Curated annotation (Swiss-Prot):
Name of the molecule in the record: Foldase protein PrsA
Subcellular localization: Cell membrane
Signal peptide extent: 1-20
Record flagged with keyword Zinc-finger: no
Organism, as annotated: Streptococcus pneumoniae (strain Hungary19A-6)
Length: 313
């Protein structure tokens, strides 16, 4: 699951409840035994230096800050729709997937909501930066729709064999795709797919190769990163249709806006800067030295800023 803003290793409840214990109190007993107990405060002192606990506290802070600032602008239906999509994707395994990630349905909903609140904030800032220069840059880099047939394979030697057949005179590329491609979404349609430079359906290497082809041209074997770590997949592409790019930028204005905003959402540095600004505006104050550095990736040292200061008040 993408964009995990809430950690699952330690529950939000444990850190939230234990952090509320005053320093002068042991709090309630969590465990009792013959001749001894383990109190909330004792447990808190043990877990607060754990990186997972610190990540949870960071995520809780982000959640609260963004909920206060943008919560009224986010419809719960957006969260419910995402949950519905995940349930459809994972089917009867959904609860098991959540459990393996250390989450319940409710904590997953909270995670998704926080992620969408951050996306909303990023979108607002990005829209304010939609300058003519940004549009021109996006236009220069944009390639409109092409239609191609693709064959995806998991073995390079097999890909070379199929390529030889694909480049033979009179080759039926569509049939080769049906017989050999591992791409279940396109193989039954002869490998046909339409995409532009902003599409995410095919790897960047495949798009680049396709855009360089003439109509009816067939690429060499293209190596692209696979879906599993350290794996590769191999593509053969035949270009069947090419759209001429208009010289009028206004013809693509809405598309270019989407491209620019998507790039901003995927720019981790930009996203971190937005989170940092919101945290600073919220005047974050760290009350326990154990957590003084949890905001450094967003707003620098936890004890070096008045908006993210360590305090024992």
């Amino acid at each position: 699951m993408k964009k995990k803003l809430l950690a699952g290793a330690i529950t939000l409840l444990s850190v939230a409840t234990l952090a509320a214990c005053s320093k002068g109190s042991e709090g309630a007993d969590l465990i009792s035994m013959k001749g001894d107990v383990i109190t909330e405060h004792q447990f808190y002192e043990q877990v607060k230096n754990n990186p997972s606990a610190q990540q949870v506290l960071l995520n809780m802070t982000i959640q609260k800050v963004f909920e206060k600032q943008y919560g009224s602008e986010l419809d719960d239906k957006e969260v419910d729709d995402t949950i519905a999509e995940e349930k459809k994707q994972y089917g009867e395994n959904y609860q098991r997937v959540l459990s393996q990630a250390g989450m319940t349905l409710e904590t997953r909903k909270a995670q998704i909501r926080t992620s969408k609140l951050v996306e909303l904030a990023v979108k607002k800032v990005a829209e304010a930066e939609l300058t003519d220069e940004a549009y021109k840059k996006a236009f220069d880099e944009y390639t409109p729709d092409v239609t191609a047939q693709i064959i995806r394979l998991n073995n390079e030697d097999k890909a070379k064999e199929v390529l030889e057949k694909a480049k033979a005179e009179g080759a039926d590329f569509a049939q080769l795709a049906k017989d050999n491609s591992t791409d279940e979404k396109t193989k039954e349609n002869g490998g046909e797919i339409t995409f532009d430079s902003a599409s995410t359906e095919v790897p960047e290497q495949v798009k680049k190769a396709a855009f360089a082809l003439d109509v009816d041209g067939v690429s060499d074997v293209i190596t692209a990163t696979g879906t599993q770590a350290y794996s590769s997949q191999y593509y053969i592409v035949k270009l069947t249709k090419k759209t001429e790019k208009s010289s009028n930028i206004d013809d693509y204005k809405e598309k270019l806006k989407t491209v620019i905003l998507t790039q901003k959402q995927n720019d981790s540095t930009f996203v971190q800067s937005i989170i940092g600004k919101e945290l600073q505006a919220a005047n974050i104050k760290v009350k326990d030295q154990a957590f003084q550095n949890i905001f450094t990736q967003y707003i620098g040292g936890g004890d070096s800023s008045s908006s993210s200061s360590t305090s024992n008040e």
